[in-house]
Amino acid sequence: QNDYKLEVLEILKTQDKKNSFKNIRQLLADSKVSDFSDLFRLLFDTVDDWGAGHIAECILILSKYQQSDAVVVDKEINIMAMFVEIIGSIK
């Protein structure tokens, strides 16, 4: 399960806006993850690598979606909404 997180980081760092969204969505669907707490932490720890120039905004996005993660029914929808905002911010 850790592999999918590293792939997400690689996608954020290297792919364009359209491909990033499509590939992250597919990756999360394929990995069948239901708990994204480790992903939130990894994204925070590595924000300097993938969010250069937008670090403060990315941290605020992570915080907002981590908070809502605790109360939403479908966590995959919540995490993809987060990636829509992140990708829109950094690409």
Question: What does each model-found stretch correspond to?
Answer:
Residues 1-91:
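AAA+ P-loop NTPase domains with strong preference for DNA replication initiators
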